[in-house]
C-alpha cells in the first residue's frame, strides 16, 4: 500500500492527535518478497490497488511466484507510486510494534500455502490465531459461509504428559465441537461457516514451564526432539478425535472445500525444521488418512 508508512504511524504517540487511532488494533500483511528484499538490501515498490488490481489478487493467492512475476513486471514499467528501503520498512514496523504493542503481522503467503482450506484466505482474526476464507456479505446469500468464526481451546502443556494426550485431545475436540454446534450467531453467514466446516482450533500454553520441568532453558536446542515428540502426539490425537466425530455427525458439509482428504500437517510442514530437529515421526499417520 502506498500509504504504509502513514498507516504504521497511526497508533504512535508521536502522531498528531487528530490523526491518531489509538483504539483500533490491526495487522500488517507481508509476504516473502519483503524479507528477500531486506536480506538483499533492496527497496520494495508500493503499488496502488487501482493501478495494479491483478497484483492485489495475486497477493492473496497460493502461488507467490506468480505474485513476484507480476510485481517485477509492474516495477519494470515504473507503475509503482513510490519505493521504500525494505530494511527501513521492517525497522519502522518493529519500532512501532515495540512502542504500541498492538500491531500484528500476517505472512499472507504462508497463510495461504500452509492451510487446509482450498479457497484463498485474505484475513485472520486480530491476534492471528485463526485464518479462514471470508467473503463480502451479501443479503442474497444468507447461507453462504462468508464470516469466519473462532472456536478455540487450549491445553496446558506442562500439565499433560504424552501418555495423557489421547484422552485429553479427544475431550477437547468433542467439547469444542459440541459448543460450536450449539452456538447461534447473529448472522446466518457465521452459522453457515461453523456448521459447514465444523472447524475448531486447539492450542497450547505454558511451554516455557514444560521446558523448565525437563531441566532445560527455553530455546535450548537439546529440548527440540522432545518437543517434536510431544507435538506429534498432540496433533495426532486431535486429528484422530476429529475422525471419530464422523460417526456421530457425519462428514462436515464443506469437507470437500478442504485438502484434509489428501494432505496431513506432516505433508506440508516447513522442511527447514529438519535442520534443527533430527527426530523422525513415530506414529502411524497413514492410518489417519484411511
Question: Could you say what each language-model-derived stretch is?
Answer:
Residues 96-194, 204-211:
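Function-dense linear segments that define catalytic or interfacial modules
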Residues 14-20, 45, 75-83, 158-164, ...:
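Inter-helical turn/loop segments and adjacent helix faces that build the functional surface
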Residues 2-3, 26, 85, 123, ...:
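Secondary-structure capping and boundary motifs in well-ordered enzyme cores
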Amino acid at each position: 500500500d502506498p500509504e504504509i508508512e502513514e498507516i504504521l504511524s497511526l497508533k504512535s504517540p508521536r502522531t498528531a492527535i487528530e490523526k491518531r487511532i489509538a483504539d483500533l488494533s490491526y495487522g500488517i500483511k507481508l509476504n516473502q518478497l519483503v524479507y528477500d528484499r531486506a536480506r538483499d538490501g533492496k527497496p520494495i515498490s508500493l503499488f496502488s490497488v487501482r493501478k495494479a488490481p491483478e497484483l492485489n489478487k495475486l497477493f492473496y493467492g497460493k502461488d507467490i511466484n506468480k505474485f513476484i512475476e507480476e510485481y517485477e513486471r509492474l516495477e519494470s514499467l515504473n507503475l509503482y507510486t513510490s519505493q521504500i528501503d525494505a530494511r527501513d520498512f521492517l525497522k519502522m514496523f518493529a519500532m512501532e510494534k515495540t512502542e504500541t504493542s498492538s500491531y500484528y503481522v500476517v505472512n499472507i503467503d504462508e497463510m495461504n500455502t500452509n492451510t487446509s482450506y482450498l479457497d484463498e484466505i485474505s484475513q485472520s482474526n486480530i491476534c492471528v490465531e485463526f485464518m479462514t476464507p471470508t467473503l463480502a456479505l451479501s443479503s442474497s446469500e444468507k447461507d453462504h459461509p462468508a464470516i469466519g468464526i473462532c472456536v478455540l481451546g487450549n491445553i496446558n502443556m506442562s500439565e499433560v504428559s504424552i501418555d495423557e494426550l489421547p484422552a485429553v485431545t479427544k475431550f477437547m475436540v468433542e467439547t469444542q465441537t459440541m459448543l460450536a454446534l450449539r452456538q447461534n450467531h447473529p448472522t446466518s453467514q457465521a452459522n453457515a461457516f461453523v456448521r459447514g466446516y465444523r472447524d475448531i482450533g486447539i492450542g497450547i500454553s505454558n511451554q516455557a514451564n514444560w521446558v523448565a520441568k525437563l531441566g532445560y532453558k527455553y530455546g535450548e536446542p537439546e529440548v527440540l526432539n522432545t518437543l517434536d515428540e510431544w507435538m506429534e502426539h498432540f496433533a495426532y490425537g486431535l486429528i484422530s478425535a476429529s475422525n471419530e466425530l464422523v460417526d456421530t455427525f457425519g462428514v462436515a458439509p464443506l469437507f470437500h472445500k478442504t485438502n484434509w482428504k489428501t494432505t496431513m500437517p506432516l505433508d506440508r510442514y516447513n522442511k527447514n525444521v529438519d535442520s534443527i530437529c533430527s527426530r523422525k515421526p513415530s506414529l502411524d499417520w497413514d492410518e489417519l488418512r484411511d
